[in-house]
Swiss-Prot record:
This is DNA mismatch repair protein MutS. Keywords: ATP-binding, DNA damage, DNA repair, DNA-binding, Nucleotide-binding. The keyword Lyase does not apply. This protein is involved in the repair of mismatches in DNA. It is possible that it carries out the mismatch recognition step. This protein has a weak ATPase activity. It comes from Rickettsia prowazekii (strain Madrid E).
Length: 891
């Protein structure tokens, strides 16, 4: 039986609760209330873990596993980490998707003794539960990516699911309805760190798919956690509204998604939730659909290894602020599908591209701004420092300077869309003055250190600090007095956290201490330490004054933070303006630096790219002083499919990716790596590129390929762009050719969308003769005897050779192996030529051979019965493939 399934009696019996020490009983009580967490239990200067938690954590953290006494003769496993290094160790636990409960001491040992005597146990309780989706510490989360906590609600007997997301670090929250078939695609876009799901979905296909595809934590909750009445009340209470319509027009499942996420935040943050705006209602169709495999294959925000280097994001990201980097990440994850909105962004990019002089100055100024979104969150959650307030102050100051730069350069002659961006930059004089007058420039990170409030801000602060300074001067006077009395010129008065103030002399001067007022405290190798009643009284007065100052500073700081929070709406608008400026100046910068051009958009099936380049490959070649070979792509209603053949290593895969990436970059509002680009808006991009066995899922290369292809054919629309590379290569040649042929026909006749289809099956090129919207293209090469030169140019025509032996030779295979392979290849070619001519001639002369619509249906009563039980809208691609195998047996 797992801990989570135990009742209180079983739990206490397991750990011998009745004979445990009071401290261990306290630990067990708190642990039982947080069975799904690793419990970090504060013990003095350490956070300690016990029993199973200790064994698990010691392995993850790489720290020693020890023991803390015995319970019924059984040793208690224990490990611990210093309190000041907590964030370092939390990072490792969160990376492994664990949930961690922080249990703090709520009183000092002295306070406990006053309350309950010498044997009193310090009061402790969980002050916060940290999960992958609820962290806000800068060291634990990416500065340039959102950190989403997501609640997924899938109503029974409905085809639409609801998703609510919150990024606690920036206090952003939104809700979206998605078709049930698009759930995984939407989760791929969001890249959530933690997903809340009903326990009823624990063994469902969706839960299984999330665990396999995404590196995130799934937190299961009982079904009642998502109950409509409960969730509606939570929303009304949280936002202090009387009617749910105050949120907007939302469905019941959206209410459940929002309410459940607010409840989870309340449970983990212990009521210390930042101010969250009313959730923004997002239209699913506003964004391009890009499924998980396509995002991975195109390496949009990470490379194939999950790292930033070599990704499109890494190539395009020359932003100078962290919030600008996050906005660019959002843009690339969520390309737009609305022409008006795309053109709005392009117009902003074009303005800055036409005014590069001001772009340089803006980018320099933006470097002086801070991530005020996350500063504001820390302030609202009572986890801030004076430096957060100073960051807001400096940002307000810089924003005003940037606004002045526009006024100085353009006066009133600014386009309205630029005016809208810079309007919030005017600043807030009241807020700026408040922080400027109150917070010291050298404010420490820790409020308990004192010295955060300027002396002149409050008369009592000045008075107490004068007292403290006078006491410190008095200490200096005492030092001089004691030197004269003892005639020890090297005598010092020092301070540490254990002894407080003490008189410090060298051992050789001990015989000069004759007056009994000098009370011995400590002897070390290099010093002997004393105190006096006079010094002790002075220290007590100093400590009391410092305590009063820190207490008053905390009160004043809390009041200042409250006033800052009152300005949170404006500060969030300011943060959005600054991040937008950063991104669009970044677009202008890369357009100028890398010779990008403004794309044009239409509502038809145009796809006219002239001299297009792959941005990532081009950037890599640039470092080696090599040039990228550009290529055109001209898809249209009349020529929707390009069938691309050519040798290995010629650049087919790069060409496929490049056109998909150009589309994505264009639809985020950026200029693109091409001489010109005219694109009919793409609603979905799908790619099937690369092949590898998925051993974890128990899938062969071919099965993985067929599942992806099946999903693409099921989800694409006429406005989609499909990129397919080597479909059918994971099986026998004739099976592969047949599948590839049939897929091409389906795309041409049924989907009628734009498609780039690369293949080594040269037999497919004959399809041009009877698929009017298909055209053959190949990669140009130059042959010189036995050698070939890859020119990387896409040209009209078809290739009948793959030049695989040439690539094998380049890879270093022995010459004897290459020569033998050439002999075998020649024999195979002689055998197959006559067969291929016969088959393909028959295919071109008799279309019905590959046109299943004209064939008579199979008469099979069992098959008919099976078909009647199927709801095509409710089966997954994997289930569809399994049915195909089943039907084949029936036939």
């Amino acid at each position: 039986m797992t801990l989570c399934n135990m009742n209180l009696h079983e739990f206490r019996q397991k750990y011998n609760y009745n004979v445990a020490t009071k401290m261990m009983q306290q630990y067990l009580d708190i642990k039982f209330a947080h069975l799904d967490c690793l419990l970090l239990f504060r013990m003095g200067d350490f956070y300690e873990l016990f029993y199973e938690d200790a064994i698990l954590a010691s392995n993850i953290l790489g720290i020693a596993l020890t023991k803390r006494g015995k319970n019924c003769e059984e040793e208690i496993p224990m490990c611990g980490v210093p309190y000041h290094a907590l964030e370092h160790y939390l990072t490792k636990l969160i990376e492994e998707n664990y949930k961690v409960a922080i249990c703090d001491q709520l009183e000092t040992p002295e306070e406990a003794k006053k309350r309950d005597g010498y044997k009193a146990v310090v009061t402790r309780d969980v002050t916060r539960i940290i999960t992958p989706g609820t962290i806000i510490e800068e060291n634990l989360i990416s500065v340039t990516e959102p950190n989403y906590l997501t609640s997924l609600v899938i109503p029974k007997n409905k085809k639409t699911a609801s998703i609510c997301c919150v990024d606690l670090s920036t206090s952003k929250i939104f809700v979206i309805n998605v078709p049930e078939t698009e759930i995984l695609n939407e989760l791929a876009r969001l890249k959530s760190r933690e997903i809340l799901l009903s326990e009823n979905l624990k063994s469902s296909n969706i839960s299984d798919s999330i665990l396999k595809q995404f590196n995130c934590r799934i937190t299961y909750q009982v079904d009642s956690f998502f109950a409509i009445n409960k969730c509606e009340k939570i929303i009304l209470d949280f936002y202090k509204i009387r009617d749910i319509k105050g949120i907007g027009e939302i469905s019941n499942s959206q209410i459940c998604a929002i309410g459940s996420i607010l409840e989870y935040l309340s449970l983990t943050q212990k009521q210390n939730i930042p101010h969250l705006p009313i959730p923004k209602i997002i239209n699913f169709h506003n964004y391009m659909t890009i499924d998980f495999s396509t995002r991975r294959n195109l390496e949009i925000v990470t490379n194939l290894q999950g790292n930033l280097y070599g990704s499109v994001l890494n190539t395009l990201n020359h932003t100078v602020t962290t919030q600008g980097g996050r906005l660019l990440y959002h843009f690339l994850s969520s390309p737009l599908t609305n022409i008006a909105k795309i053109n709005h962004r392009l117009n902003i990019t074009e303005f800055f591209y036409s005014n590069l002089g001001i772009v340089t100055r803006i980018r320099e100024l933006l470097k002086n701004t801070s991530d005020i979104e996350r500063c504001l969150t820390r302030i609202t959650m009572n986890r801030s420092s004076g430096r957060d307030l100073l960051s807001i102050k400096y940002t307000l100051e810089t924003a005003k300077t940037i606004k002045g730069l526009f006024s100085e350069s353009y006066g009133l002659n600014l386009p309205h869309f630029i005016e809208k961006i810079i309007k919030p930059l005017s600043g807030d004089a009241e807020l700026y003055n408040l922080i400027h007058m109150s917070i010291r420039e050298d404010a420490p990170n820790n409020l308990n250190d004192g010295g955060i409030i300027k002396y002149e801000f409050h008369p009592k602060i000045a008075q107490l600090n004068d007292l403290i300074n006078n006491k410190k001067l008095h200490v200096e006077k005492l030092k001089d007095q004691y030197r004269k009395e003892t005639r020890i010129e090297s005598l010092k008065i020092s301070h540490n956290n254990v002894l407080g103030f003490f008189i410090d002399i060298t051992p050789k001067n001990v015989n000069k201490i004759l007056d009994p007022k000098f009370i011995h405290r400590q002897t070390t190798i290099n010093s002997v330490r004393y105190t006096t009643y006079e010094l002790q009284n002075l220290e007590n007065e100093l400590v009391n004054a410092q305590t009063l100052v820190i207490r008053l500073e905390k009160e004043l700081y809390t009041d200042i933070c409250r006033k800052v929070i009152e300005k949170s709406s404006y500060l969030k608008i300011l943060a959005n303006s600054l991040s937008g400026l950063d991104v669009f100046c970044n677009f202008a910068y890369i357009a100028d630096e890398y010779d990008y051009t403004k794309p044009e958009f239409t509502n038809d099936l145009s796809f006219d790219i002239v001299k297009g380049r792959h941005p990532v490959v081009e950037a890599a070649l640039r470092k080696t002083s090599k040039s990228f070979v550009y290529n055109d792509c001209h898809l249209s209603e009349a020529e929707r499919i390009w069938l691309i053949t050519g040798p290995n290593m010629a650049g087919k895969s790069t060409y496929l990716r490049q056109n998909a990436i150009i589309t994505i970059i264009a639809q985020i509002g950026s200029f693109v790596p091409a001489k010109s680009a005219k694109i009919g808006v793409v609603d979905k991009i799908f790619s099937r590129i690369g092949a590898a066995d998925d051993l974890i899922k128990g899938q062969s290369t071919f099965m993985a390929e067929m599942l992806e292809t099946s999903a693409i054919l099921a989800q694409s629309t006429k406005n989609s762009l499909i990129i397919l590379d080597e479909v059918g290569r994971g099986t026998s040649t004739y099976d592969g050719v047949s599948i590839a042929w049939s897929v091409l026909e389906y795309i041409h006749d049924k989907l009628q969308c734009r498609c780039l289809f690369a293949t080594h099956y040269h037999e497919l090129t004959v399809m041009k003769n009877f698929l009017p919207a298909l055209q053959n293209y190949t990669i140009a090469i130059e042959e010189s005897g036995k050698d070939i030169l890859f020119l990387h140019n896409i040209i009209l025509g078809a290739s009948n050779k793959s030049y695989g032996l040439h690539v094998a030779a380049l890879a270093g295979l022995p010459t004897s192996v290459i020569n033998r392979a050439a002999q075998i290849l020649l024999k195979f070619e002689k055998i197959s030529i006559s067969k291929e001519k016969n088959i393909l001639s028959n295919a071109s002369n008799n279309l019905s051979l590959f046109n299943f619509e004209h064939e008579k249906p199979i008469s099979n009563s069992k098959l008919d019965e099976e078909f009647k039980t199927i709801d095509p809208d409710k089966i997954s691609p994997k289930e569809a493939l399994e049915l195909i195998y089943k039907f084949k047996k029936l036939v």
